[in-house]
Amino acid sequence: MLLFVGLGNPGKAYSANRHNIGFMAIDAIAREYGAPAFRARFQGLTSEITLSGEKIVLLKPETYMNESGRSVSDAVHFYKIDASRVIVFHDELDLAPGKVRVKKGGGNAGHNGLKSITQHITNDYRRVRIGIGHPGIKDMVRHYVLGDFSKTESAWVETLCLSIAVNAPLLAKGEDENFQNKIFHAMETAGLAKDGLF
């Protein structure tokens, strides 16, 4: 089995924030594969699906971003899985909006959600880094990530999250590079790669 974790902050006030694109990706996956309604568990909300013959537990921590590791750790210990079976979907300032990269391990790049998870289960998990771009000034980062996507941005966010969902079986099979390429081509086909997103 695999644990798919989307990072974000709980509550309507944060639901459209750039920082919540991890939640948005998990919700898109749940919709695409007809997942049962999310229920409260592991200090978060969970559901289950099957992809490529693999059981997938979907988790959205409700601990707030900075304590995400508590929720992830609860699930990891309950299912007795290694950190390598965890895939975390999160916003990435260092990638252009709409760009996606998958990596295993590494640093946290200042992301407090990743920092918390690493403290609880080590850094031996895979990350789906979802680009939201950088405001250009370090002092503006907090305001930027906690700001809502604009109406213009919403077009690529919706297309991107759908593409992540459609191609999620590739992640389940460990085909990370193929997953990235499929998403790039989907964005390109939608005409979004021509808007300076990549």
From Swiss-Prot:
Q: Which sites are catalytic?
A: H19 (proton acceptor)
Taxonomically, which superkingdom?
Answer: Bacteria
According to UniProt, residues marked as the site described as Stabilizes the basic form of H active site to accept a proton are D91
Pfam families on file: Pept_tRNA_hydro
Keyword Zinc-finger listed? The answer is no
One GO term (biological process): protein quality control for misfolded or incompletely synthesized proteins
Q: What class of enzyme is it?
A: hydrolase
> Which residues make up the binding site for tRNA?
Y14, Y64, N66, N112
Say which family it is in: Belongs to the PTH family.
**Function per UniProt:** Hydrolyzes ribosome-free peptidyl-tRNAs (with 1 or more amino acids incorporated), which drop off the ribosome during protein synthesis, or as a result of ribosome stalling.
What is the name of the protein in this document? Peptidyl-tRNA hydrolase
What's the gene?
A: pth
